[in-house]
Amino acid sequence: MAEAGHSQHFLDPEVDALPPDTVSLSDSDSDLSLPDGVGVDALSPGGLPGEASGDSGPDEPPSPPRGLPTEAVQPFHLRGTSSTFSQRSHSIFDGLEGAARRAVPAVTPASPGDGGGFQQLLTPSSQPAAGVPGRAAGSPAAQRAPPVPDYVTHPERWTRYSLDDVAEASEQSNRAAALAFLGPQNLAAPGNYMPSFNQDPSSCGEGRLVFTKPTRASEARPDRKRVSRKVGEPGRGDPGVPGAAGGEGPVELAHLARPGSPEAEEWSGPRGGLQEVGASAGVAHARPGSSPPLVETVGFHGSKKRSRDHFRSRGGSPEAPGAEL
């Protein structure tokens, strides 16, 4: 009875007076409800099983679900609308029917609690259907054959190598082969082998060139070495022998003393003075059994002349001659 009331509501004559251009389908429409005067021929391609049986009672079992829709079933169609709306609805449902035909023909029956009248199609897989010959024939990848390798087309350009007759080698076999190769090489080396110049690989380094700093001419001739010291000053080598080795004395300015001054008399005495002592003089003054001196001592002589009037004697007074200002 509820379905009869809905059909009466759809046949309300007030909606028939509306102009046909007022009904349109667009994305911006907020109210997607159908007008009251629009009639529905079929709600689905297969139709509802409950409606096809007419006014069936609630005690009657529902009819079993049918298979996929056939081509004889009319598509979804609305009556009482404008031509623009009809064309749009036809194009939409034609696209849906085309997508359903291209889908995988596997269906899952609905559960009995859902009414038993609806059929759910499985989601089509991402892989293209294998049973569609048009798509496979039109794809360029299926028509293109794999390229022939160059060594098959032009075998004269290639050289074939095979390792079938080569035995697999291990670490022990590699070591044995290396020792067998190096053995004759060591025996073939000559026994009287001499290394090249300055290339002795031994640790002793016999015949190696040693570079040293050259000595000076004065260091190369120690007999001409001159040191200044007092004659009669005991040396460190032999305290009793004057002029012994290691007995260098302080440098004095006795050569600047004036004649007749106390410094000149002191330096001209028997125990002091400036004189050149040779190797023979050292031997003459040396005691019996003592070693001769290794160096000779001479006085210090300056190369620049200095006036002796500017030097004051050690025991002199300002009244002494030569001390006037």
UniProtKB/Swiss-Prot annotation:
Keyword Methyltransferase part of the UniProt annotation = no
Q: Where is the composition biased (Polar residues)?
A: 80-90
Q: From what organism does this protein derive? A: Bos taurus
Record bears the keyword Cytoplasm: yes
Where is region (Hom2) located?
A: 73-100
Phylogenetic classification of the source organism: Eukaryota, Metazoa, Chordata, Craniata, Vertebrata
What are the start and end residues of every segment in region (Disordered)?
Answer: 1-153, 192-325
Region (Hom4) residue spans: 197-246
This protein is called what?
A: U5 small nuclear ribonucleoprotein TSSC4
